[in-house]
Amino acid sequence: MISSVCVSSYRGRKSGNKPPSKTCLKEEMAKGEASEKIIINVGGTRHETYRSTLRTLPGTRLAWLADPDGGGRPESDGGGAGSSGSSGGGGGCEFFFDRHPGVFAYVLNYYRTGKLHCPADVCGPLFEEELTFWGIDETDVEPCCWMTYRQHRDAEEALDIFESPDGGGGGAGPGDEAGDDERELALQRLGPHEGGSGPGAGSGGCRGWQPRMWALFEDPYSSRAARVVAFASLFFILVSITTFCLETHEAFNIDRNVTEIHRVGNITSVRFRREVETEPILTYIEGVCVMWFTLEFLVRIVCCPDTLDFVKNLLNIIDFVAILPFYLEVGLSGLSSKAARDVLGFLRVVRFVRILRIFKLTRHFVGLRVLGHTLRASTNEFLLLIIFLALGVLIFATMIYYAERIGARPSDPRGNDHTDFKNIPIGFWWAVVTMTTLGYGDMYPKTWSGMLVGALCALAGVLTIAMPVPVIVNNFGMYYSLAMAKQKLPKKRKKHVPRPPQLESPIYCKSEETSPRDSTYSDTSPPAREEGMVERKRADSKQNGDANAVLSDEEGAGLTQPLASAPTPEERRALRRSGTRDRNKKAAACFLLSAGDYACADGSVQKEGSVEPKACVPVSHTCAL
């Protein structure tokens, strides 16, 4: 209502007896600005802005705060308030949110400027959760901050590679939570535990040893016995590789003359053949190593949680291929037929497969696993490097062929008698050696034009190789740092789950997304949510005129049910990899209820005095779910 001072000023201005009053205009504008202002207290930090600023992004949590009539607010699934009112004490209302105050400054600045930037001092998952709570899509992040925002996703994907059983290539490190997850999965797949009850209790005693044997040969950090087995396996691997190398040395080879007598009818023919045999001691050592590898392979394939995954693993295929030739050679050594000798000759050639056992060291050394992950992650860079080299080889091989023909003598019709570059395919070898800066010296240009092409080829090779290499080095550094951090991470058996908020406790409502989904729930942990989430009524006539804010989630009806069993490691990794849009497609609603509101049985909210107190319940500690 316009004050009396303003009315008299307006009449005086109309009659011409009194000039217009600027004080009146300033006073009315100040009153309008005061009613338009809103105060948002986030984690103890007060932010002041206009309601019109919050309305710039409709459908978000702050936009619902700025709408006192509830026109743009969706109704709650749980029968919550359909309309609301905000109490005013002559000034702007203040609403409290127990969220991160630093991130909210960037969120509020997004409402003001329309540009969402990512803070550099906040972890990526925390910023993602805050965006989910305030109802802002992650795709609104500015391009300049998108790489910073995506860094935590890349780190989580790299950690998932180390946690996966087939991607890690071996057991988990000390203090590694992924090892506990894998052992838990193994127990679930292999059947009941020993001493279990129920129909499967009889088979549980038989199969209870399988998880222990699997951990004994697969996870070197599961027990002291597993470490002994790991050292024994490492010892036999090194001995087998050493034996393989010594077999090719002349000092361990024995020449033997073999006499063969062939009789065809009445004709007898004698043939002398020379054979080279390996020192028997090396054969015995190799036999002992193969017996250990056979025992290890059989135990692992019998006790593995998933036989199909075991068969598809590359390291297990290498184990089988390296063991098989030894037994075939022993079985065919007593035969003297020509076919048997041919097979033995082939098996001796196939002995080089034993050198592939060196890859089994990846189960015991983190650096080798990191190298394997780096090679797989840098596939695009390697492909780009090959394409660059192929283009350079084709171009410079053609150029060197024609450049060398410039110095040909007139008596040379082909023009290639004075040079080694007889054709373009020969120039491919020279171009590869030159671009990789090896320079064997077997082929080199002899004319001034060929030398110029050779110099250009060497410079192009240096620049071509230097471009993709830093990306590969960065990938290795990222994987190695993550692996080292994962090993130094303290062991976490069970994560702490806080008690659920009680109806009369001063705990504020939170969205479903802030619940510890990734926690490992113990059997004694209480349900995460037994009743609706409650926000305490904030009554402060000096600050906000007795304003009350009650947070509600549109999907709160489903949250009133007790939580199910603890999520599996695969589910936790899937939740970690999911984005903001997948985690929460509908942002939680925030309804404003004044102290005089009554929640009725039909779901409506009516003012004090308009309904009978018996028909409705006062809204003081009620969450609109």
UniProtKB/Swiss-Prot annotation:
TM segment ranges: 228-248, 279-299, 314-334, 346-365, 382-402, 453-473
Cytoplasmic side: 1-227, 300-313, 366-381, 474-625
Catalysed reactions, as listed in the record: K(+)(in) = K(+)(out)
Membrane topology field: Multi-pass membrane protein
Chain location of the short sequence motif Selectivity filter per the record: 437-442
Annotated GO CC locations: axon; axon terminus; calyx of Held; cell surface; dendrite; dendrite membrane; glutamatergic synapse; glycinergic synapse
Disulfide bonds: none
PTM entry text: Phosphorylation of serine residues in the inactivation gate inhibits rapid channel closure.
GO term, biological process aspect, one: protein homooligomerization
Keyword set, alphabetical order: Glycoprotein, Ion channel, Ion transport, Membrane, Metal-binding, Phosphoprotein, Potassium, Potassium channel, Potassium transport, Transmembrane, Transmembrane helix, Transport, Voltage-gated channel, Zinc
Region (Disordered): 1-24, 65-86, 490-581
Residues with glycosylation annotation: N257, N266
CDD domains on file: BTB_KCNC2_4 (cd18415)
Binding site for Zn(2+): H117, C123, C144, C145
GO molecular function (one): delayed rectifier potassium channel activity
Functional summary from the UniProt entry: Voltage-gated potassium channel that opens in response to the voltage difference across the membrane, forming a potassium-selective channel through which potassium ions pass in accordance with their electrochemical gradient. The channel displays rapid activation and inactivation kinetics.
Family, as annotated: Belongs to the potassium channel family. C (Shaw) (TC 1.A.1.2) subfamily. Kv3.4/KCNC4 sub-subfamily.
Quaternary structure note: Homotetramer. Heterotetramer of potassium channel proteins.
Family annotation (PANTHER family): POTASSIUM VOLTAGE-GATED CHANNEL SUBFAMILY C MEMBER 4, VOLTAGE-GATED POTASSIUM CHANNEL
Entry note about domains: The cytoplasmic N-terminus mediates N-type inactivation.
Protein name per its UniProtKB record: Voltage-gated potassium channel KCNC4
Species: Rattus norvegicus
